[in-house]
């Protein structure tokens, strides 16, 4: 029976800042937050922090977001390894063109034992889940049958070697046409701070699909841990149905 995969978002990389020794400047932050401040101050050579209202890293970053100088947010980045996400959801995710992606390949990795991601609206309904699982298992049986027949067809006359490997890939590529969007996939996503803010603003909205909204909320919580000054203006609240959204008065980029 197909197993259900829970959403998991793991931080796997973040920006490290190395202060140049010939610049007389210090900050109370590190990593990407320090880099963002450094980039902003480099524009005006304001190393002495002449404005006391922006002397701290948090105050400086809030100011640059307030005034729309968000290009400096592009210097720092975060990478996540995301699992327990459906193919359907990643079709939406990859529309965010400022991210970089590396996703599990259905051509190279057999899908007959892949886990399933249950749509949020079915999570509290056993009957709907049983219908979903039955449909998934039926599609996998068809996938397996097609794979066997395609392998036999494409491998006819092949004696092994690189062409045999290619034929197996071609068989998987053709057979996966019947696999459901509920199949779990896994993906590495890298984005700069500006791109992550845009993603959160768009996908943590009440108007977004619930699965990708849930992903955006989990990513936001991880991002706040990495760079609180950059992401803490987003407020997470619960809707009447128990799902969560995140909003910020400073998230103005559409």
From Swiss-Prot:
Oligomer and partners: Homotetramer.
Q: Which reaction does it catalyse?
A: dUMP + (6R)-5,10-methylene-5,6,7,8-tetrahydrofolate + NADPH + H(+) = dTMP + (6S)-5,6,7,8-tetrahydrofolate + NADP(+)
Q: What is its EC number?
A: 2.1.1.148
- Residues engaged in binding FAD: 95-97, 103, 192-194, 198
Biological classification of the source: Bacteria, Bacillati, Actinomycetota, Actinomycetes, Mycobacteriales
Residue stretches making up the ThyX domain: 7-237
Note the SS bond partners. Answer: none
In this protein, the active site sits at 203
Q: Per its Swiss-Prot or TrEMBL entry, what cofactor is needed? A: FAD
Gene, per the UniProt record? thyX
Q: Which family does it belong to?
A: Belongs to the thymidylate synthase ThyX family.
Question: If you read the UniProt record, what top EC class would you report for this enzyme, in one word?
Answer: transferase
Q: What is this protein called?
A: Flavin-dependent thymidylate synthase
Positions contributing to dUMP binding: 92-95, 103-107, 176, 203
> What are the UniProt keywords, alphabetically?
FAD, Flavoprotein, Methyltransferase, NADP, Nucleotide biosynthesis, Transferase
The listed location of motif ThyX motif is 95-105
């Amino acid at each position: 029976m197909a197993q259900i995969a829970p959403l998991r978002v793991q931080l796997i990389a973040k920006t490290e800042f190395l202060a140049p020794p010939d610049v007389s400047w210090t900050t109370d932050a590190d990593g990407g937050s320090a880099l963002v401040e450094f980039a902003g101050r480099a524009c005006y050579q304001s190393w002495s922090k002449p404005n006391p209202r922006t002397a701290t890293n948090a105050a400086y970053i809030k100011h640059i977001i307030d005034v729309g100088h968000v290009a400096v947010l592009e210097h720092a980045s975060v990478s996540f390894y995301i699992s327990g996400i459906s193919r359907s959801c990643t079709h939406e995710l990859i529309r965010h063109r400022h991210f970089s992606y590396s996703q599990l390949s259905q051509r190279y990795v057999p899908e007959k034992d892949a886990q399933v991601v249950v749509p949020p609206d079915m999570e509290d309904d056993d009957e709907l889940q049983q219908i979903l699982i039955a449909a998934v298992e039926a599609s996998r049986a068809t996938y397996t049958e097609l794979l066997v027949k395609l392998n036999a067809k494409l491998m006819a006359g092949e004696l092994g070697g690189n062409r045999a490997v290619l034929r197996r890939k071609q068989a998987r590529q053709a057979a996966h046409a019947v696999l459901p969007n509920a199949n779990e996939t896994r993906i590495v996503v890298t984005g700069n701070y500006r791109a992550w803010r845009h993603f959160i603003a768009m996908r943590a909205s009440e108007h977004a699909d619930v699965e990708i909204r849930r992903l955006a909320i989990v990513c936001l919580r991880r991002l706040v841990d990495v760079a609180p000054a950059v992401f803490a203006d987003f407020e997470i609240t619960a809707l009447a149905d128990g799902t969560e959204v995140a909003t910020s008065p400073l998230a103005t980029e559409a």
